[in-house]
Amino acid sequence: MIVIIDYDTGNTKSISKALDFIGLQNKISSDATEISQADGVILPGVGAYPEAMKELTRRGLNKTLKEIAAGGKPILGVCLGMQLLLESSNEHSFTNGLGLIPGHVEKLPEDPEFAVPHMGWNQLQIKRATPLTKQLDGEYVYYVHSYYANCPEEYIIATSGYSIEVPGMINKGNIYGAQFHPEKSGQIGLEILKGFKEVTYSCKSSQQ
């Protein structure tokens, strides 16, 4: 069972429909106990970093996510959810994040040739093969964001070219993040979610 975290800051239903489509049993929940019992967790997110982090903390889900990460279960952060996995953000004001992957969230640089937000389809360049990125080099995914993950290169598994080389996907151990929206990226997005399904089942088998 995959639990999609509901903290009033994410596109939970569209992610749930995508998981239904690939046959991955899932549930939308804000209950810490249900989330802790999941085989894997997806942290969605749209909106502003400070408000999202505040809401996670208010519900005690920041601690829940850290416990899940420490226990080795897979976590996938999507869009703002990916950014929350990092150590901090300077969106509006400095805000501490979950600190599950080293890095800091910064605004995309101003450039007359590149609009902010970065919105629309862009091509992936795979930097490191994982179950989520295999055979996806050169494929297109759908982005909507104004901020990006500035993190060490060793954690960046896919990028897209824009005003800078945007980290499209990041990974550290059992923690994954996608800056783009897999649930809005057609068949390629579904392949990425299938990769998360593979990681989840593999992790579950190894823990039994």
Swiss-Prot record:
Keywords on this record?
Amino-acid biosynthesis, Cytoplasm, Glutamine amidotransferase, Histidine biosynthesis, Hydrolase, Lyase
Q: Where in the cell is it found?
A: Cytoplasm
Q: What GO cellular component entries does it have?
A: cytoplasm
> Which GO MF terms does the UniProt record name?
glutaminase activity; imidazoleglycerol-phosphate synthase activity; lyase activity
User: Which reactions fall under this protein's catalytic activity?
Assistant: 5-[(5-phospho-1-deoxy-D-ribulos-1-ylimino)methylamino]-1-(5-phospho-beta-D-ribosyl)imidazole-4-carboxamide + L-glutamine = D-erythro-1-(imidazol-4-yl)glycerol 3-phosphate + 5-amino-1-(5-phospho-beta-D-ribosyl)imidazole-4-carboxamide + L-glutamate + H(+); L-glutamine + H2O = L-glutamate + NH4(+)
Question: Catalytic site residues?
Answer: C79 (nucleophile), H181, E183
Q: Which CDD domains match?
A: GATase1_IGP_Synthase (cd01748)
Q: Where is the Glutamine amidotransferase type-1 domain?
A: 1-206
Q: What pathway does the UniProt record associate with this protein?
A: Amino-acid biosynthesis; L-histidine biosynthesis; L-histidine from 5-phospho-alpha-D-ribose 1-diphosphate: step 5/9
Highest rank taxon of the organism: Bacteria
Tell me, what is an example of a GO biological process annotation in this record?
Answer: L-histidine biosynthetic process
**Principal subcellular localisation of the protein:** cytoplasm
Query: Which Gene3D superfamilies does UniProt cross-reference here?
Result: 3.40.50.880
**Record-linked InterPro entries:** Class_I_gatase-like (IPR029062), GATASE (IPR017926), Imidazole-glycPsynth_HisH (IPR010139)
Q: What is its EC number?
A: 4.3.2.10, 3.5.1.2
Quaternary data: Heterodimer of HisH and HisF.
Functionally, this protein is described as follows: IGPS catalyzes the conversion of PRFAR and glutamine to IGP, AICAR and glutamate. The HisH subunit catalyzes the hydrolysis of glutamine to glutamate and ammonia as part of the synthesis of IGP and AICAR. The resulting ammonia molecule is channeled to the active site of HisF.
Task: Please identify the protein, giving its name as recorded.
Answer: Imidazole glycerol phosphate synthase subunit HisH
Native species: Listeria monocytogenes serovar 1/2a (strain ATCC BAA-679 / EGD-e)
High-level lineage: Bacteria, Bacillati, Bacillota, Bacilli, Bacillales
